[in-house]
Amino acid sequence: MEKALILITAYLLGSIPFALLVGKIGYGIDIREHGSGNLGGTNTFRVLGVKAGMIVTCGDMLKGTLAASLPVLFSVHIHPLLAGVCAVIGHTYPIFAKFRGGKAVATSAGVMLFYSPFLFVSLLTVFFIVLYISKYVSLSSMLAGVYAVIYTIFFTDDIPLMIAVSLLTAFIFYRHRANIKRIVNKTEPKIKWLGRK
């Protein structure tokens, strides 16, 4: 029963739609009706600007970090990564936003922040290097995931981490399939650092 409660709580944490809340409370708009319609940090940056984008991205990451920490905080014998994955599912298919959520990147990163801080920092490094070169947030997210898979397979012996990272990366690619088509067609929007404040 305790295990089920932890997993349900993790899903509900992940379901908190920070992009929707920030858009409605802070700006009076439903972000699902603007930009890509995605409830995530990237769309928030594009539609509402840097400040709102940072708040949403940090909030989405925090969901993953808190969810992964639940088994430890409550001394429940369940793997933190499993709770973290439940939060990612909640973020992507949130019960509080008609199951229309984000693309799993920030919340997945938050899970890694709790479980493997070194991997988190190296992921962030890869993300920003690719972002600096390509100016594509989507490509940066996917290649950071590829790096994570390679790193966990060849440089760790943590089987649960390998499985979780592989599944999350595959899921991130799935959620970015429209972005992949736009990158191939050269119609994917590139980042613009200046936005509405």
From Swiss-Prot:
It holds the Pfam family G3P_acyltransf. The chain crosses the membrane at residues 5-25, 70-90, 111-131, 153-173. GO terms for biological process: phospholipid biosynthetic process. GO terms for cellular component: plasma membrane. Its main location: membrane. Pathway: Lipid metabolism; phospholipid metabolism. Its EC number is 2.3.1.275. It is found in: Cell membrane. InterPro entries: G3P_acylTferase_PlsY. Keywords: Cell membrane, Lipid biosynthesis, Lipid metabolism, Membrane, Phospholipid biosynthesis, Phospholipid metabolism, Transferase, Transmembrane, Transmembrane helix. Signal peptide: none annotated. GO terms for molecular function: acyl-phosphate glycerol-3-phosphate acyltransferase activity. It comes from the Bacteria. It catalyses: an acyl phosphate + sn-glycerol 3-phosphate = a 1-acyl-sn-glycero-3-phosphate + phosphate. Belongs to the PlsY family. Probably interacts with PlsX. NCBIfam families: glycerol-3-phosphate 1-O-acyltransferase PlsY. Catalyzes the transfer of an acyl group from acyl-phosphate (acyl-PO(4)) to glycerol-3-phosphate (G3P) to form lysophosphatidic acid (LPA). This enzyme utilizes acyl-phosphate as fatty acyl donor, but not acyl-CoA or acyl-ACP. This is Glycerol-3-phosphate acyltransferase. It comes from Geobacillus sp. (strain WCH70). The lineage of its organism: Bacteria, Bacillati, Bacillota, Bacilli, Bacillales.
